[in-house]
UniProtKB/Swiss-Prot annotation:
Gene3D superfamilies: Periplasmic binding protein-like II, Porphobilinogen deaminase, C-terminal domain
One protein family per Pfam: Porphobil_deam
Pathway where this protein functions: Porphyrin-containing compound metabolism; protoporphyrin-IX biosynthesis; coproporphyrinogen-III from 5-aminolevulinate: step 2/4
Keywords: Porphyrin biosynthesis, Transferase
GO biological process: protoporphyrinogen IX biosynthetic process
GO CC annotation terms, alphabetical: cytoplasm
Family named by the database record: Belongs to the HMBS family.
PROSITE patterns membership: PORPHOBILINOGEN_DEAM
Source species of the chain: Escherichia fergusonii (strain ATCC 35469 / DSM 13698 / CCUG 18766 / IAM 14443 / JCM 21226 / LMG 7866 / NBRC 102419 / NCTC 12128 / CDC 0568-73)
Note: The porphobilinogen subunits are added to the dipyrromethane group.
Name of the featured protein: Porphobilinogen deaminase
Quaternary assembly: Monomer.
EC number from the UniProt entry: 2.5.1.61
């Protein structure tokens, strides 16, 4: 980083800019005198909007350009929604800080119906996520699930135009954009298990940039970091790309981590679930062991079909 100036690489969507400003404000509050600049960028994920994410490379499309900016020293940190962060990082880069988690649940959004259970058979539901799709299809095979891309505002416009009867978004994104009133129902994890890291903001930087890492340390939230560590360890062992039918959610309850996970066929015809409880110090180990249980119980075949494009949808 330059003397007392820290540069944040960010996408230009309203939610990405909210996250970047959130980190900027937190850094300036912790380090008075620090100047923080935003470096807005357009990623491939922002440009390719007419194709489902699973077919164009997954959510890593939202991250790559930001990482190139870090490697070329055009920025010092990149701020990500943790559910968009791929399993692996380019050499020399890494995730060094995880901020306090917002509500991780999925949101049911509709202008006509108050809940998922109220949707009549044949209703059209929009989501861009195979994870949400497989859980919806299992619970309500009578619904029509259609792909829905674009930023939050675009997705809400498509709902308001009557293209969908309901859409599923993240509670955290709607709250951060001041759109909490659009949430008709927050879906509990038993109904829609969240994505790995959902609701958490992560910060990536060059691993050899000691000064930046020292500045970021004050923003790390240990409880969130533990929970996300367990979720990401499971996802890493599953070799889960960013656009796969994998859900994972860890809670800290009474000094124990409770980790739940699932892998589902996109059409909801198969769902492999599992859970673990254990000591926070074993967060990573628990994630790996739960992933291995899922793989042995049928997740390996489901994921192979998804990656090969053979999965029923």
């Amino acid at each position: 980083m330059l003397d007392n100036v820290l540069r944040i690489a960010t996408r230009q969507s309203p939610l990405a800019l909210w996250q970047a400003h959130y980190v900027k404000d937190a850094l300036m509050a912790k380090h008075p005198g620090l100047t923080v600049e935003l470096v807005p960028m357009v990623t491939r994920g922002d440009v390719i909007l007419d194709t489902p994410l699973a077919k164009v490379g997954g959510k890593g499309l939202f991250v790559k350009e930001l990482e190139v900016a870090l490697l070329e020293n055009r920025a010092d940190i990149a701020v990500h929604s943790m559910k968009d962060v791929p399993v692996e990082f380019p050499q020399g880069l890494g995730l060094v800080t995880i901020c306090e988690r917002e509500d991780p649940r999925d949101a049911f959004v509709s202008n006509k119906y108050a809940s998922l259970d109220e949707l009549p058979a044949g209703s059209i539901v929009g989501t861009s996520s195979l994870r949400r799709q497989c859980q919806l299809a299992e619970r309500r095979p009578d619904l029509i699930i259609r792909s829905l891309r674009g930023n939050v505002g675009t997705r809400l416009s498509k709902l308001d135009n009557g293209e969908y009867d309901a859409i599923i978004l993240a509670v955290a994104g709607l709250k951060r954009l001041g759109l909490e009133s659009r949430i008709r129902d927050a879906l509990p994890p038993e109904v829609s298990l969240p994505a790995v890291g959902q609701g958490a903001v992560g910060i990536e930087c060059r691993l050899d940039d000691t000064r930046t890492r020292e500045l970021l340390a004050a923003l790390n939230h240990p409880e969130t970091a533990l929970r996300v560590t367990a979720e990401r360890a499971m996802n890493t062992r599953l070799e889960g790309g960013c656009q796969v039918p994998i859900g994972s959610y860890a809670e800290l309850i009474g000094g124990e981590i409770w980790l739940r996970a699932l892998v589902g066929a996109p059409d909801g015809s198969q769902m492999i679930r599992g859970e673990r409880r254990g000591s926070p110090q074993d967060a990573e180990k628990m994630g790996i062991s739960l992933a291995e249980e899922l793989l042995n119980n049928g997740a390996r075949a489901i994921l192979a079909d998804v990656y090969n494009g053979d999965a029923p949808v």
